[in-house]
Amino acid sequence: SGTTGMPKGVKKPLIEAPWPQNIPIFQAAQLRYQFDTETVYLSPAPLYHAAPLGFNMNTLRYGGTTVIMEHYDSEEALKLIEQHKVTHSQWVPTMFVRMLKLPEVVRTQYDVSSQRIAIHAAAPCPIAIKEQMINWWGPVISEYYAGTEGNGSTTITSEEWLEHKGSVGRAANDCILHILD
């Protein structure tokens, strides 16, 4: 991605299975995030990044609907959640910070209660920011850490995180973690 050095391209092999066949990595995300035909996914991040592109494709794979923002705007995102009754979304911590900086009268005028899962990733989220988001949106925040290369991931729900603030969660998708100092 170029966030920590020279931009790189990650060439992944094409999946040779027919479209409707369940692929383990897609099925794992579907089970974790409960994608189904009732899913309405808000994509506030650019599709040239692997994560938003992948989540959009997975939503469509399981019969859901995607709402793609042309560019990120905090109030517009809240408006879209209410307008489309968004059930799933994906964010980076900077977006949380920007939404929390909106005047309270703006934040509270939109109904965001349709959300079942608000996924966040890409960078560590400050504890105070994540606490404020969970207080505002409820325990729908789900965090994951992973790499474009597909070399493993961790995931944590709001409930787990509130018990272990700052944790990155547990290994996901049969991944084996090695913690080194």
Locate predicted features.
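Hydrophobic alpha-helical segments typical of transmembrane helices
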Residues: 43, 55, 76-77, 95, ...
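Conserved AMP-binding A3 loop
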Residues: 1-21
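Short beta->alpha linker loops
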Residues: 72-73, 94, 124
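Short Gly/Pro-enriched turn/cap motifs at secondary-structure boundaries
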Residues: 165-171
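Conserved AMP-binding/adenylation subdomain of ANL enzymes
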Residues: 15-40, 44, 48-88, 102
